[in-house]
C-alpha cells in the first residue's frame, strides 16, 4: 500500500474486547450517521492540535506533536491516523507513523519511515467535553483493528508515563523497558503490541 495515498481506507468496525463497554453514542452509531470514524486529513490538523494542546499542556507542559508535525504526518501517512467525529466535529483522534527500528528513539518523534513495519502511536487525545465516556478505549481498539488490516504493519509501539501502562496493557501492549526518548525531565516506558497475535484477529478468523 502506498503511504502517500490521499484517500486512506475507511477503517472497519471491530468488536470491543471483554470488559470494555461501548458508550451509548457508540451503541447508536448505526442510527446516527453523524457519528463517524475515519482517517484524518491535513485539513483536520488545526482541530487535532487544539484538542491535543488542551489535553497535554496542563499535564505535561508540552505536546507530543506541534501543528506542523501533525500536518506533516497527515500528509505523508493519513492511513496511520484515526479520528472520531460527532456532527462533523473532531472529538478524539490518534496519529501514528511508521518506524523501522526495533526500539523507538529520538528521531522517531518526527520521522515517517515508509518502509517500516512498526506503527508508532504519537498521540491519543480526546476533547475535554467528551472525556470520561469511554471514548479513548473505543478509539484505541478501532485503531488497532485498522492497523491490523494493513499487511505492512506488524506491530504497534508507543511511549507513555508509568501511570498509563496498565491502560495500554488492556489492549495487549506489553512494556519492553524504559524508552530512549526523553522530553525535558520527563521519562517514559516503551510498550509494544504484536498485531499478528492480537485478540481481534483471532476472533475475526473464527479461532
UniProtKB/Swiss-Prot annotation:
Cellular component, GO, one term: perinuclear region of cytoplasm
Organism name: Pan troglodytes
Recorded GO MF terms: aralkylamine N-acetyltransferase activity; arylamine N-acetyltransferase activity
Protein name as it appears in the record: Serotonin N-acetyltransferase
Principal EC category: transferase
Location of the protein in the cell: Cytoplasm
Pathway(s) the chain acts in: Aromatic compound metabolism; melatonin biosynthesis; melatonin from serotonin: step 1/2
GO terms for biological process, alphabetical: cellular response to cAMP; circadian rhythm; melatonin biosynthetic process; N-terminal protein amino acid acetylation; response to light stimulus
Function (record text): Controls the night/day rhythm of melatonin production in the pineal gland. Catalyzes the N-acetylation of serotonin into N-acetylserotonin, the penultimate step in the synthesis of melatonin.
Reaction catalyzed: a 2-arylethylamine + acetyl-CoA = an N-acetyl-2-arylethylamine + CoA + H(+)
Gene that produces this protein: AANAT
Principal cellular location given in the protein's record: cytoplasm
Nucleus is among the record's keywords: no
Binding residues for substrate: 124, 159
UniProt: acetyl-CoA binding residues: 124-126, 132-137, 168-170
Amino acid at each position: 500500500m502506498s503511504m502517500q495515498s490521499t484517500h486512506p481506507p475507511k477503517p472497519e468496525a471491530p468488536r470491543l474486547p471483554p470488559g470494555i463497554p461501548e458508550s451509548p453514542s457508540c451503541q447508536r452509531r448505526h442510527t446516527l450517521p453523524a457519528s463517524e470514524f475515519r482517517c484524518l486529513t491535513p485539513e483536520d490538523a488545526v482541530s487535532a492540535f487544539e484538542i491535543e494542546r488542551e489535553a497535554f499542556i496542563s499535564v505535561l507542559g508540552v505536546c507530543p506533536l506541534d501543528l506542523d508535525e501533525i500536518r506533516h504526518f497527515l500528509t505523508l501517512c493519513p492511513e496511520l491516523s484515526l479520528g472520531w467525529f460527532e456532527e462533523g466535529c473532531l472529538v478524539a483522534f490518534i496519529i501514528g507513523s511508521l518506524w523501522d527500528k526495533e526500539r523507538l528513539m529520538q528521531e522517531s518523534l518526527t520521522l515517517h519511515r515508509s518502509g517500516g513495519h512498526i506503527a508508532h502511536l504519537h498521540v491519543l487525545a480526546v476533547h475535554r467535553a467528551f472525556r470520561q465516556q469511554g471514548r479513548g478505549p473505543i478509539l484505541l481498539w478501532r485503531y488497532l483493528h485498522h492497523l491490523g488490516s494493513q499487511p505492512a504493519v506488524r506491530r504497534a509501539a508507543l511511549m507513555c508515563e508509568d501511570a498509563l501502562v496498565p491502560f495500554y496493557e488492556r489492549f495487549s501492549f506489553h512494556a519492553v523497558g524504559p524508552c530512549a526518548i526523553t522530553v525535558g525531565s520527563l521519562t517514559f516506558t516503551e510498550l509494544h503490541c504484536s498485531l499478528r497475535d492480537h485478540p481481534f484477529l483471532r476472533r475475526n478468523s473464527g479461532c
